[in-house]
């Protein structure tokens, strides 16, 4: 059974399952997978970008010898690669090695660093063909056509333990039988010519180099290569099997590999435009494939990276244009309102507006009169009338509205009316990028250029419908929503709003269903500012609403902006029985008495108090001895004075 998943915006799909491993049987092995439109199987040769040198055009070459996924989604999908060495990577050890071809590589063998290691699946950048031209009797000899079309060839191995080039290849390398490393037998089923041509056009079987890791570094995501995070009897990997260049905390790039047809879009767009049917298209593709295969390997690589480099320059120029547009929008925001409207009105007067086909007004139950304020022709065509600023109008109904989509530099006025009361909300620049959904990504250019919109707020479609099941109490709903992260706190509301009106404003202005509850005012709250708690269905919707209100500005009728943030609810604690007193529970007292450790109330030699007491006693003894010696000396001096003293009579 195949399993489809999404990996960073690229198409990914598992292929045939192979077996289950791990101590807990939580590791699933696979024989193949499809990544970014290319199918990868066991023992296919792939290219892996070198993140330590982003500008380098020399990726690493490896053979897939194991594919697996852990049941824990936090652990990424893994592949084990058996490495090939290019002559430039082992140049110091090639002295005395004869007849080294230009596109020759050396198979890693032996035991030690550089044999094989575990990588993330997203580090693979593309497929390549590595052909074995060894005269070993175990190796099926390739044809001249395969030899000419191969990207790389190998006939010798490099022993990573002794760092020597050997001519013999072992029966098993990194636990893989050598028959899977040699060329496939001719008796195996091969794809037809048309299938091979289609695979070549789609960039599956003959795509030489990925366009991502070397020419489009900005589109790739950097992945640090680590050994297997889990060890089991079936999936234990040799964590020391890494290249010397890759072992020291290196990175590899998971890239978006473009197809071969995209590489040659600038070159062959004219010729391919006339071949869409039948044999003409097939013959044209065959010519292009034969021409490409006849080129040397180095030239094909250089052409591939030149094409990808041109796309990089084009993307850089496109980003520069976007930066210029952002600067102009920032400059326009800093201008006074009157001057900005005066400059915009000249360009807006001649611009046609997209209108919705709607007749008159729609009356909703419970006395809500909902009117969509738009000028609509009977045949549904666009009205090319001039756009007039709302400030020049007496009533709101005369302002031409548009679709409910939020674009930068656009004012949205929402009127909530029930009976005779009317409340207005204005939204400016809700979003810098209309990328919150696929529908919003497909907005037309007219939607991106409109600067003002007025719409009448109506009740939600399901506001008056009866419900079969009773809803949960508000407290339970709040607790469940807080666990999911879908509770949003709206501030700066009008305190006179009701919960239903807040829900209607969110539905009309932000086009989202929610459940709202106004927070009751107390003696410590500000009487002029209201707050409401809003529960959305999912966390993504809540984040989208907060992002819109944060990047843009939703103004109320009083001119105050509406502020939204995630709410953290703290339930009130249990009040004490006596105000100002803390009561100790009997259970806590009993627990403390039970867990108390018997201790002595006097000083013991094993504590700090004993040492301090001994030091104090020493100082006290010294003081007493000094005082006693001073007293004795004083008495002796007094006795001597009395003896020598003679009373003088008058």
UniProtKB/Swiss-Prot annotation:
User: PROSITE patterns, from UniProt?
Assistant: BAH, RRM
Please name one Pfam family that this protein belongs to.
Answer: BAH
- Quote the SMART domains the UniProt record gives: BAH (SM00439)
Q: Which UniProt keywords apply?
A: Chromatin regulator, RNA-binding, Transcription, Transcription regulation
Every copy of the BAH domain together lies at: 38-169
Spans of biased composition, class Polar residues?
302-315
Q: Region (Disordered) spans which residues?
A: 202-223, 229-248, 257-359, 425-448
Q: List the coiled-coil residues.
A: none
The UniProt entry's GO biological process terms, in alphabetical order, are: epigenetic regulation of gene expression; gene silencing by siRNA-directed DNA methylation; transposable element silencing by heterochromatin formation
Query: Which residue range or ranges hold the RRM domain?
Result: 486-569
Q: Where is the composition biased (Basic and acidic residues)?
A: 259-270, 277-287, 348-358, 438-448
- Gene Ontology MF annotations: chromatin binding; RNA binding
Q: Name one GO cellular component term.
A: protein-containing complex
State what the entry records as the consequence of deleting this gene: Developmental defects, dwarf phenotype and short siliques. DNA hypermethylation at genic regions. Impeded use of distal polyadenylation sites at intronic heterochromatin (HC)-containing genes (e.g. histone demethylase gene IBM1) resulting in a lack of functional full-length transcripts. Abolished expression of At4g16870, a transposable element (TE) of Copia-like retrotransposon origin, associated with methylated status.
Gene3D superfamilies per UniProt: 2.30.30.490, 3.30.70.330
Where are the bilayer-spanning segments? none
Its annotated function is as follows: Collaboratively with AIPP1/EDM3 and EDM2, the AAE complex regulates alternative RNA processing (e.g. alternative splicing) and epigenetic silencing (e.g. H3K9me2) of intronic heterochromatin-containing genes as well as genic heterochromatin-containing genes by promoting distal 3' polyadenylation; may associate with intronic heterochromatin and bind gene transcripts to modulate polyadenylation. Required to prevent promoter DNA hypermethylation and transcriptional silencing of some transgenes.
Q: How does it assemble?
A: Component of the ASI1-AIPP1-EDM2 (AAE) RNA regulatory complex composed of at least AIPP1/EDM3, ASI1 and EDM2 and may contain CPL2, AIPP2 and AIPP3/BDT1. Binds directly to AIPP1/EDM3 and AIPP2.
Q: What is this protein called?
A: Protein ANTI-SILENCING 1
Protein species of origin? Arabidopsis thaliana
Q: Which gene encodes it?
A: ASI1
